């Protein structure tokens, strides 16, 4: 066993973060980032740091491992298409049930809520479940407070909307807080996409940019969970670089393969 594998085994055993689910190159990038921050050059040295019960570092590492790149209205062409999906659903179903799977710090489900409101949907008929495995990320999501940084301008991200000020409140020069009108549409809860039970009856599931970080053998369980959570005719949206494996591909028809939106078909 290499020093890196020993480190991963410790992380999984002592923190509960399932390193075995994730692509090893992804884990290496994230762990190495923490090592550089702490001035540690060897995996064995970083393991010693964690073994010394450095709770702060363990928390920082878990945050680094769990939270992926996220922003409001990431890939605008996808959100333009999703607006049409929501309008179509509003004409065909009484209540629109949406699941944002692996929602990280909440920007995706809040984007979905803002989009629904911006499209003129009745908020009483829209319900969004947002789940993630990381409790700290969920706490940040529930707070709904986001700050612009040098590399991520929240104002630019919200520029997809005509009137973003209807959905967020400014707090100082850099911070934005999602208002209650948006928050009321979203419920957050913890869920593990690999080991957790499927949901049921959803009209739309967003599972974007999740599988690109996951080891190949666990991608199928994730997409199996997602497909079982959609009603017949429900919509699935994946990340721009993600594809459906053959084992679940037959359960879907591509609505627009360029932007990875699919419809659930009846089981045969």
UniProtKB/Swiss-Prot annotation:
Gene that this sequence comes from: cheR
Disruption phenotype: Mutants show lack of Htr methylation.
Binding annotation for S-adenosyl-L-methionine: 68, 70, 74, 108, 132, 192-193, 208-209
Enzyme class: transferase
EC number(s) on file: 2.1.1.80
Domain CheR-type methyltransferase: start-end pairs: 1-265
Keyword Transferase annotated: yes
SUPFAM superfamilies listed in its UniProt record: Chemotaxis receptor methyltransferase CheR, N-terminal domain (SSF47757), S-adenosyl-L-methionine-dependent methyltransferases (SSF53335)
Name of the protein this chain belongs to: Chemotaxis protein methyltransferase
Keyword vocabulary terms for this entry: Chemotaxis, Methyltransferase, S-adenosyl-L-methionine, Transferase
Coiled-coil ranges per UniProt: none
Gene Ontology biological process terms in this record: chemotaxis; methylation
